[in-house]
């Protein structure tokens, strides 16, 4: 259950809110709002927040949990707004977008901000879950298959360059190590099942089971201690301003 087992995802987003500098009452878009918990948190601190997500399931969950808030369906890569936002906020979403789609997504964000508006985000950064992906790569290789990391984890340098090419002024960037405890004895197996989908497409169920067992066994010596699994998260946190035209 994503809402219960991975509640650390929105929890980290609450800390990210601290680098928003727009005044209370500002219009803020929560881009990739998921279950809406951060849209509510943005509202709680005084922003006029709107949540946007491409997932019907997430939007249904968000509307059920927070019926008083405004949620819209939209794709981060291509979205438009009638009225520009003072800030666009995004937590743990950008690395789900294919790397080739990021320039277009940044253009959509830029166009949806007023001049001087802020884009504040955090996502998986360079080195994110590197130990987990290495273990999966080794396990796939032992079954004569190639593993490809199904997410885009940029460096500060390549993402700052992309933002600047779009017309943003980058004013803050950090790569943060964030080792994160996972729930229960099956925490690592559950994490792989929840977040690693694409590489297993077309893989027979029994082979998938063997690959996961091998990866988990491989990771036990580095990411399991005191009866707790830890995911080796690295987060890219950035803040950029849309320049005045």
Each predicted region: which residue ranges?
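Short alpha-helix
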Residues: 152-166
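C-terminal helical/coil "lid" or tail adjacent to the Rossmann-like core of SAM-dependent
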Residues: 171-227
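A short acidic, Gly/Pro-enriched loop at the edge of an enzyme's catalytic core
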Residues: 77-88
């Amino acid at each position: 259950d994503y809402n219960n087992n991975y509640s650390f995802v929105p929890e980290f987003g609450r800390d990210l809110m601290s680098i928003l500098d727009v005044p209370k009452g500002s219009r803020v878009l929560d881009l990739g709002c998921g279950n809406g918990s951060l849209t509510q948190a943005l509202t709680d601190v005084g922003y006029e927040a709107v949540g946007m997500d491409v997932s019907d399931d997430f939007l249904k969950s968000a509307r059920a949990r927070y019926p008083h808030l405004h949620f819209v369906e939209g794709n981060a890569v291509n979205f438009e707004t009638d009225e520009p936002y003072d800030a666009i906020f995004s937590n743990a979403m950008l690395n789900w977008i294919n790397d080739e789609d990021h320039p277009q997504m940044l253009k959509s964000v830029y166009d949806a901000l007023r001049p001087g508006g802020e884009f504040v985000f955090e996502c998986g950064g360079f080195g994110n879950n590197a130990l987990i992906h290495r273990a999966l790569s080794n396990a796939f290789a032992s079954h004569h298959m190639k593993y490809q990391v199904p997410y885009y984890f940029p460096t500060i340098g390549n993402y700052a360059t992309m933002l600047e090419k779009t017309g943003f002024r980058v004013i803050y960037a950090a790569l943060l190590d964030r080792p994160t405890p996972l729930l229960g004895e099956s925490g690592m197996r559950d994490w792989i099942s929840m977040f690693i989908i694409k590489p297993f497409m077309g893989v027979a169920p029994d082979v998938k089971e063997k690959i996961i067992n091998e990866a988990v066994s491989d990771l036990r010596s580095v990411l399991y201690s005191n009866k707790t699994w830890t995911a080796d998260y690295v987060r890219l946190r950035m803040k950029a301003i849309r320049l005045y035209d």
